[in-house]
Regions:
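Divalent metal-coordination and catalytic microenvironments
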Residues: 3, 21, 29-30, 53, ...
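Active-site neighborhood of phospho(di)ester-bond hydrolases with catalytic His/Asp-centered motifs
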Residues: 29-32, 47-57, 81-83, 157-162, ...
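Short, surface-exposed connector motifs at secondary-structure boundaries
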Residues: 75, 152-154, 213-219
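Cap/insert and terminal regions of metallo-dependent hydrolase folds
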Residues: 164-254
Length: 255
């Protein structure tokens, strides 16, 4: 599996894109910065998008993608997957014909650009040879991470935004995860804010990793605040985990 890091930042600044991870050029996990980075041809290859939660930095590009499709020559369709509360928020507060046109009924309800599909935590769905399972994670709004397995039984887990989530690690125990992409947003000195907003710090990450057995082969950090990137990197390096590193926009992960 090839995962292209379209964006992995915890805040938007020049050179720092909101979260979006593209699997083998065709399946997207979160959609924070899709349309501002990929050209039209690459955008139109994406038919399925899995959303971890409904915060704006994870869904922002979906409206612009729908708009690019409807005005283009290739009238492709895109399916948006997530748990019920996330789908409901996207439908009610985004595609409501007030904030943005309702592309779930455009050009007509029977042939719409967007199809919203609800998932249940712990239940798998098969897409293009991949098995995808959502697992609940701890965040300030309903949120999930995704366990993804290919035909060769290679697996990665993408946490999305998450604070300490011991129940999640119990549920994916013994899955032999080859790659973990996990949120570390703040330096350890900001632990109180991290816990209040349901994110991780390097110290909290260390505690979480102690709960994951077996430990994933490689661990990638996503969602760091650009203002604290150097501090977070220094603290991550001090943990002495040989297989942990912070992602940057444009990175390619091969699982």
């Amino acid at each position: 599996m090839k995962i292209e890091v379209i964006g992995c930042s915890g805040a938007e600044m020049p050179g720092h894109n909101a979260p979006a991870f593209l699997l083998d050029d065709e399946i997207l996990f979160d959609a924070g910065s899709l349309t501002s980075v990929l050209d039209e041809k690459a955008q139109l290859r994406i038919k399925n998008i899995f959303i971890t939660h409904a915060h704006l930095d994870h869904i922002r590009s979906i409206p612009f993608l729908a708009d690019n499709i409807v005005v283009g020559k290739d009238k492709s369709k895109v399916t948006i997957f997530s748990i019920s509360p996330v789908i409901r928020t996207i439908k009610t507060h985004l595609f409501n014909s007030a904030v943005w046109p309702d592309f779930t009924i455009i050009p007509n309800p029977h042939d719409a650009i967007l199809n919203l599909v609800e998932l249940k935590t712990g239940q798998s769905i098969k897409i293009n040879g991949y098995t995808v399972i959502p697992y609940k994670v701890n965040h300030t709004v309903p949120a999930v991470g995704y366990l993804v397995e290919d035909r060769h039984r290679r697996r990665f887990f993408y946490s999305g935004d998450t604070g300490p989530s011991p129940n999640t690690w119990k549920k994916i125990a013994n899955k032999k995860i080859h790659c973990l992409i996990i949120d570390v947003s703040f330096p350890s000195s900001m632990k109180e804010l991290a816990l209040r907003t349901a994110h991780l710090t390097p110290d909290l990450l260390k505690t979480e990793l102690a709960k994951i057995r077996p430990l994933p082969g490689r661990i990638f950090i996503t969602h760091p605040k650009p203002q604290y990137f150097k501090t977070i990197k220094r603290e991550i390096d001090s943990l002495k985990f040989r297989n942990v590193r912070i992602l940057k926009d444009g990175d390619i992960i091969r699982v």
